[in-house]
Amino acid sequence: MLWAFIVWLGALCIYGSAFDILIYAPRMMQSHVYFTARIANVLAARGHKVTVIDNVFRYDVDNELSSDIHEIISVEPSPEVTKLLNTGSLPTILWNSKASPEEQRTIMEGLGHVHRLQCTHLIENSTLIPKLQEIKFDFAIHEVFDSCGVGILEVIGVQKTVIVSSTGPMDVVPITLGISDTLNTPSLLSDYGSYLSFFEKRRNLKFLSGMLNFHEMQDSMISPLFKKYYGLKKPTGEIMRQANLLFYNIHEGSDGMRMRGRRSFDIGGIAFKDQKNLTMEYQTLLSDPRPKVLVSFGTAATSSHMPQNLKNSLMTAMKQMNNVLFIWKYEMEDNFTKQEELTTNIIFKKFLPQTDLLASSKIDLFVTHCGQNSLLEAFNSGVRVLAVPLFGDQHRNAKLAFENGLIEILPKSDIETPAKIVKAVKTGLEPNAKLDQNIVLISSLLRNSKENAENLLISTIEATYSTEFPPNFSKFPKNYHPNTLVRLIDSSIALVFMLFIFVFVNHFRKNYVGFKYPLSFSTK
């Protein structure tokens, strides 16, 4: 009876101090959706009253929200967005991209165009904002990958905010909030790790510029609309600096050095899914005595949209390794899969229970695009990784993990050559005591990370918003824009070059102009 009273009293205290929380969750990229949904579900399970804006870009991505959520307000996808995404061009573009500032900028411009079309649709055709203006929220949570949330929260009067990121810090966040040094911070889009050499800084600034351009091009279209319909006056940067907390989907065991603000927290592991029992089909598959390699490139750049030459090269390489069983996530049945039905060491699957397979201790190597969630899942399960980074943060994720001695990298360009694939897979499967030691270490660090991340999220949020005026980033120093620093570097180089030419010409004129050589012979 006493225990029942204590439980009742605890529940009363929790619900009595529950917050009204608004979470903006654009349903576009699976990893982003799941990370944000996990935060919503954890807070709702705690007893807080959580309302979620489910801004739907794609119906083939589930919103992952639990029944504990108080209310889900859905926004239908824009017809233009649906048309663009149904062309299937995005995965093809991602597969054909290169790790250069120019190409990553182009990719982000394409994604930014999709986001601003959906935001325009939301502002002009949805009743969402007027409805939200009638509700009082204590604070809101959003991921700034989609800039629409910044404007929505401001026009409905929510100025206490939490910024979350399903990857490491989005470049726009540390730069705008003043918690990093623009010149020395590797961009999320870059292929750099923890440090930048002197000669890498300018190229890195171009990556930073590309990422900021992704947000600026969204802002250039949607800010005037927010101003037109709802009288928004504040610039996006000023609104972002009202944030009180930052949460990142990273873990110190696999991440690199970063400059941190006082209110920045790592909650890598919070998105781990609970392990389920494998079906009899997969149990039978995993009983095969051969080494088993799981191949999955995520939900954005799907295997079925891989360029044909890369598919053929992968297939050729796999066939050369008959003693290895490959389980390949390939999202559709097509001529490519049908012509390989008789291949005995390759299994195609439209869907894979990735978490459960990795946790089975039967997977010897995971070939992955190196998305943050996939990488952390593999480390948590103690599975070796062969990374094939394709776009966005994947190149940097791979570089950081490689620096920490946790993975091997197969550059996408090497997939064109079957011999290089064979060599990389064999290297990934052969004994490597140092690699195994590092993986055991990171796996042990991640063992309780889900519970720890949930507790950190809850305790930090509840402590922060127990005060009426929690501190924000409005007083932090402002950083220079990457483009400004690029111009400064280029101007400095040009000035040094001009000074060199001036000194050289001046030296030449003084020493050689008008100089008369002595005669080397005499006349008689």
UniProtKB/Swiss-Prot annotation:
Gene Ontology cellular-component annotations: membrane
E.C. code: 2.4.1.17
Family matches, as Gene3D superfamilies: Glycogen Phosphorylase B
Transmembrane segments: 488-508
Keywords: Glycoprotein, Glycosyltransferase, Membrane, Signal, Transferase, Transmembrane, Transmembrane helix
Homology family: Belongs to the UDP-glycosyltransferase family.
Protein name per UniProt: Putative UDP-glucuronosyltransferase ugt-56
Species lineage: Eukaryota, Metazoa, Ecdysozoa, Nematoda, Chromadorea
Gene for this chain: ugt-56
